[in-house]
């Protein structure tokens, strides 16, 4: 009987490996950005799209991916996504231009959108006892948080010995392991009442999210008040509003918008979105800060983010344990407040601040905050749904993470770019650089470093310092934006997130079908525990 019980945790291990692959690729590329910028002559805008090309398609297609899993079978869709992820990783590694790399990253995002919601949906169907499910979700969330920090470390280690393409090639053997183990261990499950696929809803959701993020990323180039930016954002919001209206008209919607009437579901989704907004924006900045401002090599930059992984791992189990005692509201609000305070510390960090001072303190506060936010909030989302709708619930949870993260990189990256660009142009012009040269330096911090190296020898130290200080100005401004967003999220969690699910909000699990294999597994596991 024990082996049957243990099998569920082996299933969880396979699901966590799949999650690790998907989430690591959100951040592993960040540490390679300076190298990619040099090799592919990529601007800051192109670097943002190398990051956002993945998260944009990932976020835009998550609802479709979750919906397909509910209809076709979650294990089948997960396996398809893993195979596609391996193939597109090879495509990214073979890219010769920034445009090719952006296209490959976008294709990887499509694969990730099939993988991510299936993992949480399968978990929800395997762990049917609420307390065990909360623990499993806590582990799943911890792996997601760890993967964010592991990405720069593993990327730095690879770049120490190989080219930037290695950060994509490394996915292939892990995909093979996940495919084989998944085939042997994972049970199949689906929603027997899924209904017909909604192609118009899929098109509207993808179009709305894509247009919104594109408009924000391009805002610094066009201007925040330009017709392109205002029209793009307005058009995106209109498309998303039409999507919401269309879903209310469908008998079998991709996303049942009535779920958002449940404050436990909607407030938890918002908390995750805003937490990842700040987190991904900061990771985008900090990996470049370690290499450009502090002069670390890629491995050193990756290792410098290691405290984030350690703190996340340390606090994730505690977050679930505390949530079981005091409820979701206090834990999630506390986590968001910790994140906000971490961003405030980051905003006061100077170029020469000791690493073991404000830098580590800022990262540790953010990591602890992430642990206290994501696990409990994810459990609140999944606990509000019947198991046959686990794919839809997982897709909402994953979409909020990816949309929040995508917009975080877009908005905070735009603030960073604007702050750095305006200050470096003024500073380098003051040192005698021609206006055209100064504006070229303002395109990216790597371009600024190269420009400073071409100044006369006597002025090179001053020019290099001007580039570093301008970049720090952008980091300060971006960190303050993240601090403000997570502070607002803290207040919203306290105001709207219930401490525990009320009876009227509990899912109708009795009516939810459970796969036969999972039902037997759960019964045998319960008997083994009683023994």
Q: Where are each of the predicted segments found?
A:
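C-terminal membrane-cytosol helix-exit motif in multi-pass small-molecule transporters
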Residues: 172-190, 208-217, 236-250, 492-497
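Flexible interhelical linker loops that connect adjacent transmembrane helices
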Residues: 2-4, 177-206, 248-263, 324-325, ...
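Transmembrane-helix bundle of Major Facilitator Superfamily
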Residues: 1-184, 317-319, 326, 344-347, ...
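Transmembrane core module of solute transporters
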Residues: 9-58, 163, 200, 225-388, ...
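A membrane-interface helix-boundary motif in multi-pass transporters
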Residues: 160-172, 218-228, 297, 418-483
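Interfacial helix-cap and linker-helix signal at transmembrane-aqueous boundaries
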Residues: 36-37, 68-69, 157-162, 216, ...
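C-terminal module of multi-pass small-molecule transporters
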Residues: 73-82, 95-99, 115-119, 126-138, ...
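Transmembrane-helix exit segments and adjacent C-terminal regions of multi-pass membrane proteins
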Residues: 1-19, 242-245, 264, 368-370, ...
């Amino acid at each position: 009987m024990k082996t049957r019980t243990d099998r569920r945790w082996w299933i969880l291990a396979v699901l966590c490996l799949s999650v690790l692959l998907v989430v690591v690729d959100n951040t592993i590329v960040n540490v390679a950005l300076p190298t990619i910028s040099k090799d592919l002559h990529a601007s800051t805008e192109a670097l943002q799209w190398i990051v956002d090309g993945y998260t944009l398609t990932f976020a835009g297609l998550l609802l479709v991916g979750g919906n397909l899993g509910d209809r076709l079978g979650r294990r089948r869709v997960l396996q398809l996504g893993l195979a596609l992820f391996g193939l597109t990783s090879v495509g990214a590694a073979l890219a010769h231009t920034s445009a090719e790399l952006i296209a490959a990253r976008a294709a990887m995002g499509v694969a990730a959108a099939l993988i991510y919601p299936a993992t949480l949906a399968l978990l929800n169907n395997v762990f049917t006892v609420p307390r065990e499910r909360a623990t499993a979700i806590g582990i799943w969330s911890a792996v997601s948080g760890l993967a964010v920090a592991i990405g720069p470390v593993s990327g730095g280690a690879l770049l120490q010995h190989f080219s930037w393409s290695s950060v994509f090639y490394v996915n292939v053997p892990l995909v093979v392991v996940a495919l084989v183990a998944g085939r042997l261990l994972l049970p199949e499950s689906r929603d027997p009442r899924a209904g017909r696929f909604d192609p118009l809803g899929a098109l509207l959701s993808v179009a709305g999210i894509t247009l919104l993020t594109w408009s924000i990323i391009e805002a610094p180039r066009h201007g925040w008040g330009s017709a392109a930016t205002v029209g793009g954002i307005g058009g995106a919001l209109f498309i998303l509003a039409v999507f919401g209206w269309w879903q209310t008209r469908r008998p079998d919607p991709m996303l049942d918008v009535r779920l958002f009437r449940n404050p436990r579901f909607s407030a938890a989704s918002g908390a995750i979105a805003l937490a990842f907004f700040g987190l991904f924006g900061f990771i985008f900045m900090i990996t470049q800060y370690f290499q450009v401002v502090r002069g670390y090599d890629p491995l050193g930059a990756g290792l410098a983010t290691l405290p984030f992984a350690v703190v996340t791992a340390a606090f994730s189990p505690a977050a679930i344990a505390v949530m079981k005692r005091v409820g979701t509201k206090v834990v999630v609000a506390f986590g968001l407040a910790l994140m906000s305070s971490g961003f405030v510390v980051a905003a006061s960090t100077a170029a020469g601040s000791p690493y073991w001072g404000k830098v580590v303190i800022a990262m540790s506060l953010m990591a602890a905050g992430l642990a206290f936010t994501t696990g409990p909030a994810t459990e609140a989302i999944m606990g509000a749904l019947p198991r046959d709708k686990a794919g839809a619930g997982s897709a909402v949870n994953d979409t909020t993470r990816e949309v929040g993260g995508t917009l975080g990189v877009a908005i905070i990256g735009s603030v960073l770019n604007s702050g750095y660009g305006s200050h470096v142009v003024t500073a380098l012009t003051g040192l005698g650089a021609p206006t055209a040269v100064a504006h070229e330096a303002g395109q990216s911090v790597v371009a600024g470093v190269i420009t400073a190296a071409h100044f006369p020898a006597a002025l090179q130290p001053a020019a290099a310092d001007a580039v570093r200080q301008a970049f720090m100005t952008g980091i300060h401004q971006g960190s303050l934006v993240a601090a403000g967003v997570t502070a607002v999220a803290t207040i919203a969690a306290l105001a709207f997130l219930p401490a525990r699910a009320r009876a009227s909000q509990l899912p109708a699990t009795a009516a939810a079908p459970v796969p036969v294999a999972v039902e037997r597994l759960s019964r045998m596991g319960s008997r083994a525990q009683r023994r």
